[in-house]
């Protein structure tokens, strides 16, 4: 499947996210529970831990999208990615549950992205003390980040 970056507005980005989820979910469900425990890179996270990270990413970005629609500017804290994965004991979580939650959350985020008004896309957003970017960048970067990790686990 070709999930390459496409030009367009938020409705197109929302459609792209739905297409990614619909294409990848069956591939993730085909990964066995035992296979999901194996690190994808030497010394790195397992597929299960990557899924936990992607759920955290969805949760954090959901708040960013909504709060930026309600404000003239957004200052949002960063988060400890490795710490989140560790304290939630993602490695012990049920694989099918993680995949199902990830897919459902991203389908909902596609709905939210489709609601982003054009006049809010330039809302300045600062995350975790980084440089200021636009809400459009945050939304597009979310999908690119998602794809990076799906490629990392071999399903995109």
Give residue spans per PLM region.
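A generic "alpha-helical surface" signal
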Residues: 11, 15-18, 48, 52, ...
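Residue-level recognition of alpha-helical structural elements
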Residues: 6, 13, 36, 43, ...
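A short small-residue
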Residues: 1-5, 82-90
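Short, contiguous alpha-helical
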Residues: 2, 35-81, 107-110, 124-156
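Alpha-helix N-cap/loop-to-helix boundary motif
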Residues: 9, 16, 42-46, 53-57, ...
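Extreme N-terminal tail/first-helix region
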Residues: 1-23
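A glycine-rich, hydrophobic loop/mini-helix early in the fold
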Residues: 26, 30-31, 40-41
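Acidic/histidine-rich alpha-helical segments that form the ligand environment
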Residues: 16-27, 85-122
